[in-house]
Amino acid sequence: MKKSEIIELCGGGYTARINLSRGANCISLRHSATGARILREPPDPMRLDNPYLYGMPLLFPVNRIFGGRFVFRGREYVFPVNEPNTGCHLHGTLHETPFAVTARSGDSLTAEYTADAAHPYLSFPHAFTLRLSYRLEADGLHLKTALTNRSDTEMPYFLGFHTTFSLAMTPKTDAEAVLAKAELSREIERDMTTYLPTGRLPEFDAVSAALAAGTWHPASGAISRHYRAGGGGLLTLTDPETGLRTVYRNDAAFGYRLIYGDGKAFLCMEPQTCMANAANAPFAREETGFAFLRPDETKQFHSQI
């Protein structure tokens, strides 16, 4: 097995480890003063039992596309169906694709991936560059993502991160006491056999209401729910016994969330630019976050932990 290329950053009282071999995924973020391990860390950088459940893997195209197909501007886009039980394409493969370093210092790293005619990405018919820029500061980890359309036609995009937090923030943390909060506006009901939107936006039940209020315990049970973000879109985890709090900020371009957890050790709080199956969902496209870039256009996104 090829050795994984890991780069360690230090700054602002934090350390981070970036796995260049697997989508420039930040697989570790630690706070030096408290010993907190903020992100769920893989037991081995190259032996991941589930590549989505460690660090903050990049998803492109994010979430599910039914049949792996959709039509935009008269062109049919076809992605491989890599989730046979749902008949969907799921999350793309950038999370397992090597990225190249373009800039580096002790507390920062920029890495990028470029697809072109000679090196296409899956069957995606566009040349593009996706750049991830990490920086550690006193207020945590900043991630700037830049996506550039290098083709001569409009390019649809669906972007997200499968950011996975450890409920046991420190060795002293009681995972069962940890509280989660997400700023949400509406739940997006899904058919739980295909995990695709049904077209309904139900009122919050007790779990969603507690999550929105910050009184929900992630260790109380497994969860898999899809939402539209609300307010500033903040996501937080709080250890009430130590007073430690993890805050996850994402800019307004990430208008959707997927909240997923095993009810024991971790919680995924996933920022996404669009709804699941955005191009085919039973909503108008302007309601699903479906977006595109014009030729040579660059869109930037910002996140912070």
Where are these regions (language model features)?
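Active-site/ligand-binding surface loops and adjacent short beta/alpha elements
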Residues: 78-79, 154-156, 164-251
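Short Pro-Gly-centered flexible turn/kink motifs
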Residues: 70-78, 291-305
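Acidic, contiguous internal or C-terminal segments within carbohydrate-active enzymes
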Residues: 9, 16, 20, 31, ...
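Short, hydrophobic/aromatic-enriched beta-strand segments in well-ordered soluble domains
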Residues: 18, 111-113, 239, 296-305
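Acidic/His-leaning functional-site neighborhoods
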Residues: 14, 88-102, 174, 209-288
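Acidic-aromatic substrate-binding/catalytic surfaces of carbohydrate-active enzymes
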Residues: 17-76, 82, 267
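Extended, loop-rich substrate-binding clefts of extracytoplasmic carbohydrate-active enzymes
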Residues: 1, 10, 80-138
